[in-house]
Amino acid sequence: MKSNRSRLLFLVVSIAALASLRAVDSGPGKDPATKALSVFSEVFSLTRGNYVDPTDPKTLLEGAYDGMTDALDPFSYYVPAASMSAFRAQQASGAVGPGIIVARRGGFPYVVAPLPGSPAQKQQVQPGDLIHAVDGKNLRNAPLWKITSALEGPEGTTVEVGLFRVVEDKKVTVRLRRERFTPPPLETRWENDLVIVKIPVFTASTAEALRKAIDEAGRRSIDRLVLDLRGSIGGDVADVAPSATLFVGRGPIARIVSRKVPLKPLEATGERVWKGRTVLLTDEATGGPAEVFVAALKDRANATTVGTATAGMAIVQRLVPTGSGGSLFMTVGRYQSPSGTILGGKGLSPDERVITFPGDTESHDPILERGLEVARRGVARRAA
């Protein structure tokens, strides 16, 4: 019955979408949005009256709402009115999760990335893992808010997460502890001719730690710097400005494109300190504040990016209540680089793309190896 219901929801949304497009394209007359709503109403009525099994109007409508938010981006979702009390109660309860950023694409929930230092990262939950179950409950087609709620719970408890690892074509089950955690600190590794700095997440102390590494590089007469931002996700975008300032000096770091919400641009206010060659390592788990940092250094410090495309999470989201009592959690703004590149959505493509494989280990790190090669050869960044 659940399978039939899933197919039914898919058919309702798909038929409504196709019919809406047909109505929009047909001749003059009504406003396209009015036409689309009229067609949707007709499809809804026809489905209720003619589908082989009795249908629940609430189920049909909630499926349509989920389809609508899925069409926006992987991070937006709708919470129905009947679930808002439980949703608010969980938010206010102090519930914690295992440190997984979750999104939905094509109706399937997946791991964007584990948060740095989290139980999920320690248990090697990987970006791109599909989530099919939480504590034995099938959540393959569940809306995003239900998955997030299922992952969270009282601090100190555990949660079992069923994953499908696409790159290895296998199912993986992990038991994760729900706990508060501290992101790991910035790491510095020195070589004879360059310095490698790993930035796990941007915090209030990141700029100071970066400044110390830059000052030490000056004392060692090193003018090549590799910044490893792979897996750097989460944190506060306000902490990006002091760090980016060290590389770009005064001026714009990012602005926010939004239709309705007035948001201030991000500006660097200090002096540029580092003037050597900079290489940035990125992957699919480089997201949010880290993407803003990478884009600013690409545009204004001629930094070269090496690795894979970033997460596309440089966005601003808001919970917007609806008149029916539900709420839309949706993207209301996207960060834009100084040159005008939109960061939220597709993510940033690297200047030097590196293909990676599941068997890659710390002893064979193709992205780092290529980054060191670029830094040492002085390969100039290709135009975007």
Predicted regions and their residues:
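An acidic helix/loop motif centered on a single conserved Asp/Glu
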Residues: 55-72
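PDZ/PDZ-like peptide-tail recognition elements
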Residues: 63, 74-113
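Hydrophobic membrane-insertion alpha-helices, especially the h-region
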Residues: 7-22
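Short acidic, Pro/Gly- and aromatic-enriched capping/linker segments at domain boundaries
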Residues: 322-334, 349
